[in-house]
């Protein structure tokens, strides 16, 4: 028996993958089933599809993923899992020499307080963030600064 599911709305990483595939000169062949088939929603073998189990997590936080050129193509990309769960996920390809104008606009948007998620081991102690002054819950008022946290993850993996 086959269960019909509503189509999954493409999220930021899915759109990044589609855009990257459009620029590709050859097919991207990730390891997979006998013929490389994967569910378009969760990128697992169709027999192991998790799309019906995808949770919706209410949160005020957003996530900005800065990914290498082919990262969105990889089925093991954990940024895809974040985008599956956090509605306000943004994904951008990253290159040192060119910055996407939408990324600059997102970082300058007054509703967001960008926070780069990075190990603090080799960082001056005064630059390490150990907490955010935000109220919990999706319906909570804005933080004391009036901004929502935007966690910036480098490479999204």
Where on the chain are the PLM-derived regions?
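Histidine-anchored nucleotide/phosphate-binding helix
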Residues: 52, 73-85
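Short hydrophobic beta-strand segments
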Residues: 62-72, 113-118
């Amino acid at each position: 028996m086959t269960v019909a599911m509503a189509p999954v709305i493409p999220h930021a990483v899915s759109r990044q993958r589609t855009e990257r595939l459009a620029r590709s000169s050859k097919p991207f062949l990730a390891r997979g089933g006998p013929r490389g088939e994967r569910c378009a929603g969760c990128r697992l073998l169709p027999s192991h599809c998790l799309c019906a189990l995808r949770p919706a997590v209410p949160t005020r936080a957003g996530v900005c993923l800065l990914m290498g050129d082919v990262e969105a193509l990889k089925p093991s990309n954990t940024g895809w899992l974040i985008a599956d769960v956090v509605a306000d996920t943004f994904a951008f390809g990253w290159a040192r020499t060119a910055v996407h104008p939408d990324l600059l606009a997102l970082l300058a948007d007054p509703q967001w307080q960008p926070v780069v998620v990075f190990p603090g081991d080799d960082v001056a102690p005064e630059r390490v963030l150990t907490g955010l002054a935000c109220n919990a819950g999706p319906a909570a008022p804005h933080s004391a600064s009036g901004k929502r946290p935007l966690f910036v993850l480098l490479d999204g993996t």
